[in-house]
C-alpha cells in the first residue's frame, strides 16, 4: 500500500501533460484576420501586464510572510519552503489559465464562422487547459510535499501559500474586472446608448481583459486553493484516526488521483448532439466526471480502507455537488422564476429592480444551506460519528474531497465563460458577419450560466472544506489543554468578531470597485467629450487609459483585504487566546457562507435579468426597463464577481492562519 502514495504525483503530472496537449491543439487553430488579431492582442497585452504586476506585488508580501514563518514556527524552514511553493503553484495555475484563455478567445471567434460545434469545441478545450492545470498542480504539490516531509502538519505551509494567492487573485481580479465592467456599462449602455463591446467605448478593452483576470485566473486560484486545503484538511483529520484506519492520510490523495483520470476521460464526452444544446453538452462532462469518479471511489475505498461507510460519504459529496449546481442554475438562469421576477420588476424602475434582486439573493440562501446541513449530518453519522467524533469529522472531510472530484470539469466550465465572452467582444469590435455574432452570442449566453453555476459549487465546497479545517484547529486547541464551550463569553466574543469580518471585508472590496468605477466613468466621459469623432467611428478611443486606471486601483486596493485576513486571526488568537479564535472561525464560516451565497446568486440573477430584457422582453434594449436592469446589473456585478467569491478565499485563509500558528496561539492570550 505504501507505493500507492506515488499515484498522486503521477496523476498530477499526467493531468499537466493533457493540459499541454489541449493547449497545443488550440494554438493550431486559425487566429482570424488582422483586425481580430489587433483586438485580441490588446486584450492579451492588458491581461498579462496586469497579472505580471499583481504577482510582483504578491511576491513581496509572500517573501515577508515566509521570513515570519521561518523565525516564529518550529520547523519554520520546511513550512516556509512549502508556503512559497504553494504560492508559486497557485500563481502558475492562474498564469497557465490566463495564457491559454487570451489565445483561445480569438480562435473561438474565428471558429464561430464554421458553426456552433467548432466554436464550442475550441472554447471548452481552452477551459479544460485551466481545469486540468489547476487539479494537476494542486495534487502534485500536496502529495510531493507529503512524500518529502512525511508529516502532514508540515504540508500546511503549502496550503497557506495557495490560500494567500487565491485571496489576492480573487480580490485584485474582482476589483479589476468589475470596475471596468461597471464603468463601461454605465457610460456606454445607459448614457451613450451604445451596445456592449462597442469599439467606441474606451472601457471595452479593460472590460474584456477583466473577464480573464476575474473569471479565469481568479476562479482558477480559488479552486486550486480549495482543492489543496480540503485535501490537506482530510489528511490532517486522517492523521488523528490513524489507529482505526492506517491509510487515512493516503486515502484523500488516492481519491484525488482517480478523480483526475475521470476528468481527463470526461473532457472527451463534451460534444454537441443533434439538438444543438450547449449546456447539455457541458453537463455531460460534469456528469461523466462524477459517475466515473464514484465508480472508482467504490473500488479505492474497499481496497484501501475496507469500510464501505466511507464510500457513502463520497456519495454524499457528489450529491451535494449536483444539488448546488441545480439550485444555482435555478436562481440565475433566464428560464426560471427568480430572474423573470427581477426582469418584470425593472418595468417600474431601478428601485424596484434593486429591491427584487436583494429579495431573490436573500431567498437563494435557504435551499443551499439546508443541503449543506443535511450533507454534514449524513456524512458525519453515516461513517460512525455517533461512536467516534474523530471518524465522523473525517467523514465530512471525505465528502468535501468527493465534491472536489469534479474540480477539473468545473474549472473548465468557468474558464469557458470568459473565453466565449471575449470571443463575442472580438466579433463585435471586428465587425464580423451577423451569423458569427449569433454563434458567439449563443456560446456567451451559456457562459453566463456556467460562471454562475461554478460560483455556487465553489461556495459549497469551501463551506465543507472550512468546516474540516476548523475541526483540525479544534483538535490542536484541545491537545493544548483548552476546551470550547458556546456559553463561554470569550468564545462568544470571538463568534461576534468572526460574524463581523465578512461584512467589513465586503465593505472594503465593494468600496474599492465603486471608487475605481467612478474613475473609469469619468475617463470614458472625458474621451467622448474631448476626442472628436469617437461616436462617429472615425477616431479611436484611448483604451489603455482605462486599463491603467483599473490596474492601479486593483493593485492598490487588494492590500487591505489581505492584511485583514492574516492579521485579524493572529491578533485575536494572540490577544484573546485560542478559544476566542475558535469562536471567530465558527462565526466567519457561518456568516461568510451565507453572505457569499446571497451575493453570488443575487448578482447572477441581476445579470441575467438584464440579458433577458436584452433578448427582447419587457421592452428590449434601450427601454426604461433595460436602463433599470443595467443599474441592477452594475450593483450585482461586484456582488457576484468581487465580494462574494473573495469571501470563499477569506474563510479558508483565516482557517489556514489559525492552523499554521496554532502552536504559537495556544500559549498566548488573556483568556
From Swiss-Prot:
Localization (cell): Cell membrane
Marked site positions, Important for ion transport: 170, 215, 222, 641, 652
Chain residues that bind Mg(2+) 1: 181, 185
Requisite cofactors: Mg(2+)
Superkingdom of source: Archaea
Reactions the enzyme catalyzes: diphosphate + H2O + H(+)(in) = 2 phosphate + 2 H(+)(out)
NCBIfam families recorded: PRK00733.1-2, PRK00733.2-1, PRK00733.3-4, PRK00733.3-5, V_PPase
Function text: Proton pump that utilizes the energy of pyrophosphate hydrolysis as the driving force for proton movement across the membrane. Generates a proton motive force.
Name of the protein described by the UniProt record: K(+)-insensitive pyrophosphate-energized proton pump
